[in-house]
Amino acid sequence: AETLVAAKIVKDVKSGVKVLANGELTAKXLTVKVAKVSAAAKAAIEAAGGSVEEA
């Protein structure tokens, strides 16, 4: 979450970040550490060779 705030992708993180599936995932071997993730987003990340860690 701190990385997203530092990159000015989000303004503030109080309760963590939830990743939702919307659009096309072009990154490969992406590792994501988030509070929540939708099933579709998790499947897309894993299909692209990445991994998801839920806090």
From Swiss-Prot:
Cited InterPro entries: Ribosomal_uL15/eL18, Ribosomal_uL15/eL18_sf, Ribosomal_uL15_CS
Spans traversing the lipid bilayer: none
Gene Ontology CC annotations of this record: ribonucleoprotein complex; ribosome
GO molecular function: rRNA binding; structural constituent of ribosome
Pfam families hit by this protein: Ribosomal_L27A
GO terms for biological process, alphabetical: translation
Keywords: Ribonucleoprotein, Ribosomal protein, RNA-binding, rRNA-binding
Cysteine pairings via disulfide bonds: none
Function: Binds to the 23S rRNA.
Quaternary structure (record): Part of the 50S ribosomal subunit.
Family that this chain belongs to: Belongs to the universal ribosomal protein uL15 family.
Protein name listed in UniProt: Large ribosomal subunit protein uL15
